[in-house]
Curated annotation (Swiss-Prot):
It is a multi-pass membrane protein. Gene3D superfamilies: membrane protein fhac, membrane protein fhac: a member of the omp85/tpsb transporter family. Belongs to the SAM50/omp85 family. Disulfide bonds: none annotated. The keyword Membrane applies. This is Sorting and assembly machinery component 50 homolog B. Pfam families: Omp85 (PF01103). The gene is samm50b. The keyword Membrane applies. Residues 45-125 form the POTRA domain. Keywords: Membrane, Mitochondrion, Mitochondrion outer membrane, Transmembrane, Transmembrane beta strand. Its main location: mitochondrion. InterPro entries: Bac_surfAg_D15 (IPR000184), D15-like (IPR039910), POTRA (IPR034746).
Length: 469
């Protein structure tokens, strides 16, 4: 919980002849101490002053919102609890290396008999910090170097430069983060970036240079993100053997898009949850603010988790999405959906389901995927705790489909097309949870419903990532 120091109302001498207390008085002293303890726990108190010590470049008015709740405490237990909650809020701001709390009796001419002073002793982060770490994406690893200027203007602002080098993607970017005073979850971010990625399943390479702005707005139980992105995209062939369909997509495009994301997440963990649910809905509209990409895109994710006996967890998930071109121009290969691989429909190659040309997968305009999973602790564990708690056995059933749509037809024809030629798979394996960062899966898969052109992985398949079906 951190350190909360509560100084006593009086200084009590220790027992012993040399310390001025006779052993005959010990019973009286014990009775006095019990009385004092009862007074501390049950008597009404008033928090008269809340002080913050150790501030350098941080503005005091910015922190006032985080500590104001301490003044509402009415007894010592509430003071300690609300002080701890305020300490957690101060640490959450990301501008302090350490925060300690000291609770003491009020002193001075205006001190009340039951008055308390609460002092937060803070240690600010350095003006310039650096970091080095590794990240795991969807079946991809990367090394990340970062330079950060925390609390740049004294009210929680943050300027970050980050360079990432991965197995399929290299990027660097500069971002500025500004939270709202008193409401850290409500914040504004501006990003400048360049990303170069390789997509071997499509024989495609893509370089994006762009700018984006994001506004995060928590509302009741939901988190909302409003975003505008302007990006200059350069598409090219990854190999000389790239199909004509991919070569036809090569060149430069400009994309200007507005998007909105709503998230409801009650899971106890994002990596390997035991309970709770997730609902994520994302809409993207491109073309109305400029650029030559014109489409409306919708993407939905739903996940339910329920814990059963012996620590087993049953999980069900459903993904779905559709992209609708606005105007006569077809959608770009960079904007379509992709399906298949160890993080979605297991037993198939990475993004190797659906429309393709000469072995290059072109993505689809509509898709759905569902999964049913049973996670259990490792059998024959000698005791709880330790390394074994990071592992789970995994039984799964996955299904899905992806296709292009004829928008001249009605919704019934679209649903019928998505219900045809369903790919599905089942299998079992082992999962390793890497803290709250990522998870690794090693599964033995049995792909079924394989269609012509699909790339399968019949047998052992390894997956690493954050988002799994």
């Amino acid at each position: 919980m951190g350190t909360v120091h509560a100084r006593s109302m009086d200084s009590y001498p220790m027992y012993g002849r040399d310390l001025g207390v006779n052993t005959d008085d010990m019973e009286v002293m014990e009775a006095v101490q019990e009385t004092k303890q009862e007074v501390l726990e049950n008597k009404d108190v008033v928090v008269q002053h809340v002080n913050i010590e150790g501030l350098g470049r941080t503005k005091e008015d910015y922190l006032g919102y985080e500590i104001s709740d301490v003044f509402t405490a009415r007894n010592l237990v509430e003071v300690m609890r609300k002080s701890h909650e305020a300490r957690q809020r101060l640490l959450r701001l990301g501008i302090f290396r350490d925060v300690e709390v000291v609770i003491d009796i009020s002193e001075g001419a205006d001190a009340l008999p039951n008055g308390l002073d609460v002092t937060f002793e803070v240690t600010e982060l350095k003006r310039l910090t650096g970091s080095y770490n590794t990240m795991v994406g969807n079946n991809e690893g990367s090394m990340v170097l970062g330079i950060k200027l925390p609390n740049m203007l004294g009210r929680g602002e943050k300027l970050t430069f980050q360079f990432s080098y991965g197995t399929k993607e290299t990027s660097y970017g500069l971002s500025f983060f500004k939270p709202q005073s008193g409401y850290f979850e409500r914040n504004f971010t501006v990003n400048l970036y360049k990303v170069t990625g390789q997509f071997p399943w499509s024989s495609l390479k893509e370089t994006d240079r762009g700018v984006s702005t994001e506004l995060s707005l928590p509302l009741w139980m939901t988190d909302h993100t409003l975003k505008w992105e302007g990006v200059w995209r350069e598409l090219g062939c990854l190999a000389r053997s790239a199909s004509f369909a991919v070569r036809e997509e090569s060149g430069h495009t400009l994309k200007s898009a507005l998007s909105h994301t709503m998230v409801v997440d009650t899971r106890n963990s994002a990596i390997l949850p035991r309970k709770g649910a997730l609902l994520r809905i994302n809409q993207e509209l491109a073309g109305y603010t400029g650029g030559d990409a014109n489409f409306l895109k919708e993407d939905v994710e739903l996940q339910l988790n329920k814990q059963f006996i012996w620590g087993s967890v049953l999980s069900a998930s459903l993904w779905g999405g559709m992209i609708y071109p606005l105007g006569a121009q077809p959608t770009s290969i960079a904007d379509r959906f992709y399906l298949g691989g160890p993080t979605s429909v297991r037993g198939f190659g990475m993004y190797s389901i659906g429309p393709q040309s000469e072995g290059d997968y072109l993505g689809g305009e509509a898709y759905w995927a569902g999964g049913l999973h049973l996670y259990t602790p490792l059998p024959f564990r000698s005791n709880k705790g330790g390394l074994a708690d990071l592992f789970r056995t995994h039984f799964f059933l996955n299904a899905g489909n992806i296709c292009n749509l004829n928008y001249g037809e009605g919704p019934r024809a679209h649903l019928q097309k998505l219900a045809e030629c369903i790919r599905w798979s089942y299998g079992a394996g082992i999962i390793l949870r890497l803290g709250n960062i990522a998870r690794l899966e090693l599964n033995y898969c049995f792909p079924m419903g394989v269609q012509s052109g699909d790339r399968i992985c019949d047998g052992v398949q390894f997956g690493a990532g954050i988002r799994f079906l």
